[in-house]
Amino acid sequence: MSETHIPYRLDGKIALVTGSGRGIGAAMAVELGRLGAKVVVNYVNSVESAEKVVDEIKGLGSDAVAIQADVRQVSQIVELMDKAVKHFGGLDIVCSNSGVVSFGHFGDVTEEEFDRVFSLNTRGQFFVAREAYRHLNNGGRIILMSSNTAKDLSVPKHSLYSGSKGAIDSFVRIFSKDAGDKKITVNAVAPGGTVTDMFHSCSQHYIPGGDKYTAEERQAMAAHASPLTRNGFPLDIAKVVCFLASDEAEWVNGKVLTLDGGAA
């Protein structure tokens, strides 16, 4: 007797999430595990944070492992994917989450700052996707990280970050064509303001005169950007990522889903 298929479950799948020791990436990893996937938790600096995520996934009844890699280094991306396949015996889902934020008038941007942002947000994601394609089983999923500022929301002094994410939208469109030979779908999520430690460190830039307010006051103000009058949280993003990772999302391909509660 064949097993009953439960929609949106990920039992038997193996997922890898870059930058998943905290924030949105950690929420992705935990939700993938909650739905039955075995998860590779990638981190670059804090093994303690990554191991907490691993423990949480194991506590949900799935399996996970933390693997260090700096996705700005292509050789480390290759090694990360190789280790993931060796550890779990395959790979079905790759979520590219690692990224950095940047603010500044484009007239003041240095070459060093340009390279810092694009090396991770754009170049890093390109090569994560390349290695995902090479390592994924047929019928796999590649899910990249864009931003609502890439196209939908114009924020002053945010050109470098917005541009680094805008490239992801083009990558997704073309990658989805190229990956069809392995029946791999390629999509991205484009979050708006999402309450994480990164949000609190830079929210003053999104609100006129934001320096006059506390982090808590800025969070309360940001809730009114959405007609739903609440903040976005990592779980809001993770739930959509898990949908894109599921069999039920097979016909969603080459798309960028804006996740900002209608703010943009």
From Swiss-Prot:
Oxidoreductase as UniProt keyword: yes
Enzyme Commission code(s) on record: 1.1.1.-
Active site: 146 (proton donor), 147 (proton donor), 161 (proton acceptor), 165 (lowers pka of active site tyr)
Disulfide bridges in this chain: none
Entry keywords, A to Z: NADP, Oxidoreductase
Summary of the function given for this chain in its UniProt record: Short chain dehydrogenase; part of the ergochrome gene cluster responsible for the typical purple-black color of the ergot sclerotia. The ergochrome gene cluster produces several ergot pigments including the yellow ergochrome secalonic acid and its derivatives, as well as the red anthraquinones endocrocin and clavorubin. The pathway begins with the synthesis of atrochrysone thioester by the polyketide synthase (PKS) CPUR_05437. The atrochrysone carboxyl ACP thioesterase CPUR_05436 then breaks the thioester bond and releases the atrochrysone carboxylic acid from CPUR_05437.
Protein name, UniProt field: Short chain dehydrogenase CPUR_05429
Lineage: Eukaryota, Fungi, Dikarya, Ascomycota, Pezizomycotina
